[in-house]
Regions:
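Hydrophobic membrane-targeting alpha-helices
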Residues: 23, 27-30, 78-81, 105-108, ...
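N-terminal first transmembrane alpha-helix
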Residues: 1-65
């Protein structure tokens, strides 16, 4: 049981890293705008490939994490889309998600949305939303429950 859960934890961590890299691609997009003006699309294509590969890798890692976690079928919850503050780590990302959404809305209304800080907030909203869904969801909850069972 412990070996399978450690595989599940590893895949879950890999998915989080992949989603972080995917979100970080938004930070590079405005920086490569100058290459579009000069007629070179190579960097845009590379960033697009990185975005899609990390998104796909993150989803596959989540699937493999779910497959390798014991006791997940006993938990009746699904993804953490509409659940908030299910544990301490999730609460941190939920607060960051709310702050990021508010900041993005304010910046979009106050500016024309082309400032670099808008991209930073969009990247933050993307990553914190994904983390919200993962950390409030069934897999992470199952890992916490199994950890508490093994410690007791």
């Amino acid at each position: 049981m412990k070996n399978e859960n450690s595989k599940g934890k590893a895949f879950l961590l890999l998915s989080m890293i992949a989603f972080f890299i995917m979100s970080a691609t938004f930070l590079v997009m405005p920086l490569i705008q100058t290459n579009i003006d000069s007629g070179s699309n190579a960097y845009n294509i590379i960033i697009g490939i990185i975005f899609w590969l990390t998104l796909i890798f993150g989803m596959i890692s989540l699937f493999l994490a779910r497959k390798n976690i014991n006791g997940i079928k006993e938990i009746k919850r699904g993804i953490g889309l509409i659940k908030f503050f299910q544990n301490k780590i999730a609460a941190i990302f939920d607060i960051l998600l709310i702050i990021s959404i508010i900041g993005l809305i304010i910046l979009t209304i106050a500016t024309d949305g082309t400032l670099y800080i808008c991209y930073i907030f969009f990247s933050a909203v993307t990553f914190t939303f994904i983390m919200h869904c993962i950390l409030n969801g069934k897999m992470f909850n199952c890992l916490i429950i199994n950890k508490k069972r093994s410690e007791a």
